[in-house]
């Protein structure tokens, strides 16, 4: 299969899965393993994530701009920013310290990804079925303690296959946030988290950048951006109607198929 076709596939998969609780990293790594995509290696995976980051900024630009311009006068805007920063810190700190181990060991073990997808799917099913009356319905007004605990849950996503979105959504639901606000807070938290991961990965892999790969990277980036914009615009309403169970079953199916593929194909 030509590299440009694989770049389109991986870019679309990145965009579609980054902001739903199915683990974009798990999907990208498994696809890369089975499809044999090695043209740009780690650099490609890093660069297409930037497309997903820009998608959130694009969709929520008006809201983010309002927060930024009222930061000096509006206590609610300052608390929202503080909640995102506080939620980011645990995974940001742990990810920085464990980056090399995670990339060298966990990211190179497809079986770990498959098992994480399956276990995370069952965990998401359990959390989704908890019938507790939501206390918090506005992602911009979560208490700081709630935001920090959601951030602790995000640390679980350092294990590939767990899903950053899945971990933060599960944490938010357990803290009695409603499903729509849990999804939105996960979007906002994704921006500093993914930007931090992007910066660290790029700093460690920039020497691998090559002008020969620019076209493939650009193609994957654009596909990820467009797919992520569509996903971010649709997923909150979908979650409000259907909950997170469809994503949980998808995770379980992908993880099981991945294990079968590893057993019979390698």
UniProtKB/Swiss-Prot annotation:
Enzyme Commission no: 3.6.1.27
Q: Which InterPro entries match?
A: UppP
Where does the source fall among the domains of life?
Bacteria
List membrane-spanning regions: 4-24, 41-61, 80-100, 105-125, 139-159, 182-202, 212-232, 245-265
Enzymatic class: hydrolase
Which positions are tagged coiled coil?
Answer: none
List cellular component terms (GO).
plasma membrane
Bilayer topology term: Multi-pass membrane protein
> Catalyses which reaction?
di-trans,octa-cis-undecaprenyl diphosphate + H2O = di-trans,octa-cis-undecaprenyl phosphate + phosphate + H(+)
Listed under GO biological process in this entry are:
cell wall organization; peptidoglycan biosynthetic process; regulation of cell shape; response to antibiotic
Compartments where found: Cell inner membrane
Pfam families for the chain: BacA
Q: Which GO terms describe its molecular function?
A: undecaprenyl-diphosphatase activity
Keywords of the record, alphabetical order, are: Antibiotic resistance, Cell inner membrane, Cell membrane, Cell shape, Cell wall biogenesis/degradation, Hydrolase, Membrane, Peptidoglycan synthesis, Transmembrane, Transmembrane helix
- State what this protein does: Catalyzes the dephosphorylation of undecaprenyl diphosphate (UPP). Confers resistance to bacitracin.
Q: Give the free-text miscellaneous remark of the entry.
A: Bacitracin is thought to be involved in the inhibition of peptidoglycan synthesis by sequestering undecaprenyl diphosphate, thereby reducing the pool of lipid carrier available.
Q: Which family does it belong to?
A: Belongs to the UppP family.
Cited NCBIfam families = PRK00281.1-2, PRK00281.1-4, undec_PP_bacA
Q: What is this protein called?
A: Undecaprenyl-diphosphatase
The protein's organism comes out as Phenylobacterium zucineum (strain HLK1)
Q: Which gene encodes it?
A: uppP
């Amino acid at each position: 299969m030509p590299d440009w076709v694989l770049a389109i596939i991986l870019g679309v998969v990145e965009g579609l899965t980054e902001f739903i609780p199915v683990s974009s990293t798990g999907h990208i790594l498994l696809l890369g393993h089975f499809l044999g995509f090695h043209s740009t290696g780690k650099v490609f995976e890093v660069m297409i994530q930037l497309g997903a980051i820009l998608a959130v900024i694009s969709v929520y630009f008006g809201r983010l701009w309002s927060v930024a311009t009222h930061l000096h006068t509006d206590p609610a805007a300052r608390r929202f920013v503080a909640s995102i920063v506080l939620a980011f810190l645990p995974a940001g700190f742990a990810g920085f310290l464990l980056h090399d181990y995670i990339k060298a060991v966990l990211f190179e073990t497809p079986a770990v990804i498959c098992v994480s997808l399956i276990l995370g799917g069952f965990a998401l099913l359990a959390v989704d079925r908890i019938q507790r009356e939501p206390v918090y319905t506005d992602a911009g007004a979560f208490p700081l303690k709630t935001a920090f605990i959601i951030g602790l849950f995000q640390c679980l996503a350092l294990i590939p296959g767990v899903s950053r979105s899945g971990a933060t959504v599960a944490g938010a639901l357990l803290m009695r946030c409603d499903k729509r606000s849990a999804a939105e807070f996960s979007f906002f938290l994704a921006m500093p988290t993914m930007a931090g991961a992007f910066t660290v990965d790029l700093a460690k892999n920039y020497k691998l950048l090559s002008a020969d790969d620019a076209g493939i990277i650009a193609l994957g980036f654009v596909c990820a951006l467009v797919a992520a914009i569509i996903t971010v615009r649709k997923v909150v309403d979908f979650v409000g109607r259907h909950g997170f169970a469809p994503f949980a079953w998808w995770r379980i199916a992908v993880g099981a198929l991945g294990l079968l593929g590893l057993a019979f194909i390698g």
